[in-house]
């Protein structure tokens, strides 16, 4: 038997420290890249590749091995990551180069900053039904567990492709346009998954949109943080992004999707997520005109 309270505490502690690590890792990545910050997605892509490898590998491993070994495998992986981190070269000093001496509070008084965090959090919130219930949802509509796993892999594969391609044009486009288009595609993705889950070819195509609903939006978000929270503000800006978007947005998405799923069923839950994402797209387009997301030469 699993101690529910004990499991919740373990996950709480893990989430507390893991989110802190992710925020600082993104900050360090941008500092290492210095003027080549547009290459962020070329590094972030390896996390997605690792996800695919572990997902496929775990499916093979746990067909013969008990799940009790999973925590030990996770611990080993984290220890290896920690040891590798000690081998990283000293990062370049970039804080002194920043001429912007405003504090974190000054940044948070700007309406575009608040709107951007709200849009990004809503986008993460509307991923709740996917993250929590997608496997159960497609299985309830006749897909096998293996097919559900392949749909997950397909979505992350599309994300990998976008991460490889994005650095080539991210500096030459208006990121507000990319953000808005990605949110519109997200709205279509959730609504159509909710309305037509029995069409395999459509579900496959919609999974490819994960490249935009996560990959593109995350890349735009990282660039937004870089522009609005430069120098010594970068770590706190990234921590705010991670905590507010993935922490608050992700947890509320999981909670509300569970409540809606129980009350209205899976299809309507996805459709409501799509409508919320559509509202977020309109806020992004009309509310972020002064969000400093235009084309930059460096």
Region locations from a protein language model:
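Cytoplasmic helix-loop-helix junction between adjacent transmembrane helices
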Residues: 12-46
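Loop-to-transmembrane helix entry/capping segments in MFS-fold secondary transporters
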Residues: 34-46, 145-146, 229-242
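Symmetry-related core transmembrane helices of the 12-TM Major Facilitator Superfamily/SLC fold
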Residues: 69-87, 268-287
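Helix-to-loop junctions at the C-terminal end of transmembrane segments
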Residues: 62-63, 161-175, 261-262
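Structural signature of the two symmetry-related core transmembrane helices
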Residues: 177-192
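Helix-loop junctions at membrane interfaces in 12-TM secondary transporters
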Residues: 1-11, 194-206
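Helix-loop boundary and gating motifs at the non-cytosolic
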Residues: 112-153, 218
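Juxtamembrane intracellular "pre-TM" segments in multi-pass secondary transporters
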Residues: 88-122
């Amino acid at each position: 038997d699993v101690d529910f309270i004990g499991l919740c505490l373990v996950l709480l502690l893990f989430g507390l420290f893991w989110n802190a690590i992710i925020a600082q890792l993104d900050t360090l990545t941008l500092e290492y890249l210095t003027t080549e910050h547009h290459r962020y997605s070329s590094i972030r892509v390896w996390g997605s590749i690792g996800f695919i490898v572990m997902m496929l590998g775990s499916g093979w491993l746990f067909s013969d091995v008990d799940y009790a070994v999973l925590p030990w495998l996770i611990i080993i992986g984290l220890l290896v990551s920690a040891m590798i981190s000690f081998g990283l070269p000293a990062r370049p000093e970039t804080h002194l180069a920043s001429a912007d001496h405003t504090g974190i509070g000054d940044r948070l008084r700007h309406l575009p900053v608040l709107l951007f965090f709200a849009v990004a959090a809503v986008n993460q919130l509307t991923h709740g039904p996917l993250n929590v219930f997608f496997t159960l949802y497609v299985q309830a509509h006749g897909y096998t567990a293996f097919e559900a796993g392949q749909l997950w892999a397909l979505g992350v594969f599309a994300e990998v492709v976008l991460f490889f391609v994005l650095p080539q044009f991210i500096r030459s486009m208006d990121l507000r346009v990319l953000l808005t288009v990605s949110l519109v595609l997200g709205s279509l993705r959730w609504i159509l998954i909710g309305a037509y889950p029995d069409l395999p070819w459509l579900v496959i195509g919609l999974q490819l949109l994960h490249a935009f609903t996560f990959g593109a939006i995350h890349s735009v978000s990282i660039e937004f943080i870089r522009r609005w929270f430069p120098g010594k503000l970068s770590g706190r800006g990234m921590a705010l992004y991670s905590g507010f978007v993935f922490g608050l947005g992700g947890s509320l998405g999981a909670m509300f999707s569970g409540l809606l799923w129980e009350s209205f069923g899976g299809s309507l839950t996805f459709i409501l997520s799509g409508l919320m994402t559509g509202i977020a797209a309109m806020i992004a387009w009309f509310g972020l005109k002064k969000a400093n997301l235009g084309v930059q030469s460096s």
